[in-house]
Structure formats: structure tokens, C-alpha cells
Amino acid sequence: MNFAAEGYNSFETKKTPSGVIKYLPDPKAVIGLIQSGKLKEHILLVQGGTTTFLAPALSMGAIGVITMSGAPESHLGILAREFQMPCVMTAYLTNSDTRYVTGGNNDAHFAAIIDALEGKKAQLHCEDRETGRVAILG
């Protein structure tokens, strides 16, 4: 299987959710997705592991999350484990050398990930203890 991105795995699971990746930059986007009734059709892409505004989506049945920063010990990593929801954290593109740098300017890194993943049908693979992976389908 060809993996477009990988990162830290928030917890080991055999669940392999698939859906269209949707970037959620702010609380308004989260509420809009919930109100659309299409939450369970999407894997959620967010900037950080401290993205607390994503909590309503988790409790309403989100199927999976990809973060561009943050660690399994972050707020979102803990919530993902609590909700038993696959979550790939601090994702990076496997065909790129760019990586998230703590305290650095990561705008280009974030933009590249959003551009490469948003709107793509994907499947999360979190069966490895340490590494979560994102496969693009079709």
C-alpha cells in the first residue's frame, strides 16, 4: 500500500477508517461540518494537537484525525485514545523532506500537507505502535 503521509500514532488500533480528508482551520469549520450531517464521511485534518475546538466533533462520531503538529501526549492525542479514534499526529508527507519544527515557522510545511491531502479519499492505518499512516485511495 502506498502511504502519502505518516506521523506519530496516538494509540495502536486495528480500525482503518476511510473518508475524504477535510481541513478544519477553526471552530466555525468544525460546527459547519457537524451541522452538515456529513461528519462521519470525513477524516479531519487540523493544525495542532492542542486543537480543543475539535472536541465537539469527537463526541459526535468523528472517524479519524490527522494533525500537522502535536504529540500523542497532547490534549487531542489523549482525547483520541479516550474516544478510541485513530489519530495520526505531526504528520509529514512521505515524498517530502519537510518536517514540523517546534518553535519554527511551519507555514510552508502546513500548506504543503493541506494541499496534498485535503479533498482526497484516504484511509488511516494505526496498527503500528509508534507510527500512524495515511493511505490515499483510488
Name each model-derived stretch.
Residues 1-69, 73-74, 78-138:
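Non-catalytic, soluble scaffold/interaction modules
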